[in-house]
Each structure stands twice: as structure tokens, then as C-alpha cells.
Amino acid sequence: DIYWCTADIGWITSHSYILYGPLSNGATTIMFEGIPSFPDYSRFWQIVEKYRVNQFYTAPTAIRALAKQGSSFLKNCDLSSLKVLGTVGEPINEEAWQWYNKYVGRNNCPIVDTWWQTETGGILISSIPKVIPDKPTFATKPFIGIQPILLDEKGDELKEFNTVGKLCIQYPWPSIARTIWGDHKRYINTYFSAFENKYFTGD
């Protein structure tokens, strides 16, 4: 597959999902220097067409910025090579999700909404194309082997639907950050002191 993640190369997303991830899985990866609005707002879609991109991974901020320009910049671009779309970096709102689905995915590409952090080393919560149905604005299910838990302020598990709590991960996973360089106490205090024996995400 031809895979394109539009993240800035200095961010963990690009380390994991432009370099290490795609290349270690035998994919062809695209590195892009520039902004999606220059020389005009069709820049992303011209690249998708030129290189026949199959998997496209970008941030909701970029999607919202492009959606504000309408759909005219996509009309003359062939996006038929796209098979999977992804979002990363922040929650995606309903309007942006629907625009992405309709105009970029042509209502024919699963949208993989991902949740993770620099400290997690990789995606922990995400839909899986063709396995878990898309649900607009939701990252949906934990990835294989990941066991998230929602806690109240006292550390008790919340099992009700549509409730607000503190997102934690119950057990370690292979890519978890091991420490903060030169300050292991800070690492423990930041991620493991709020709730005993659980990784606190801050979300």
C-alpha cells in the first residue's frame, strides 16, 4: 500500500506513523513538506492522485481547515485509490467527520479515528476497518490487548454508558514509556500516582 500520514516530522505521530510503522510493515510511505493550502487547497488531493495513496492519516484541525473551503478543490482530483482514512491528534467533530467521509472518502472508505499519546508509543483505542463499524466522532474500541478503564474521582470503576470519568489503562503494554529521562520520580507521579497500579492518561 501507499501510505500517507501528514503529521509534522518532529511529532511522535510522524516518528511512529510516517517512519517506523509503515516501513517496518513493508508499506511505501510519503513524506510531505509544506502546508495543505499552498499553492491552493487542492494540494493534499493532488498528492493523493499523483502517488495513488491508499491510506491517508491526518489531523481534525487540517480537515476542518480544508472543509471551510468547501468541496470545489476536490472535484478535479481522482481519489479513487483511497481505501482507508484516519484521524489523529484530537477528537474530530461531527461536521468535519461527515465532510471527510463524503468528499474525501466518497462514502466508501472506513474512517479510523485513533486515540493515543506520545507516552503510549502507539495507538491504543481505534476502530478496525471492516471489523468494527465506523461511529462518527468516536475512536470506538481498545486495540488488541489494551484494557482501558473509566474511573470516578475515588478510583471506582464507572460502567454506565454516556458517563464522564478518568480514562486509565489497567495493565502495561509493550510500547509504554518506561521513564522520564533523568527524573523517574516525576514519571511515577505523573502517570501512576492518581490511581493505584493504573496508568492515568490525563483524559
Predicted segments, located by residue:
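Short coil-to-beta-strand transition motifs
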Residues: F138-G145, Y199
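Active-site glycine-centered loops adjacent to acidic/histidine catalytic or metal-binding residues
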Residues: D8, G89, W116, T140, ...
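Conserved AMP-binding/adenylation subdomain of ANL enzymes
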Residues: D1-C5, I9-Q55, Q69
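Conserved ATP-binding/catalytic segment of the ANL
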Residues: E157-N162, C168-D203
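Gly/Ser/Thr-rich phosphate-binding loop
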Residues: D1-Y3, Y20, S24-A27, N54-T58, ...
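Alpha-helix/helix-capping structural signal
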Residues: T61-R64, P174-S175
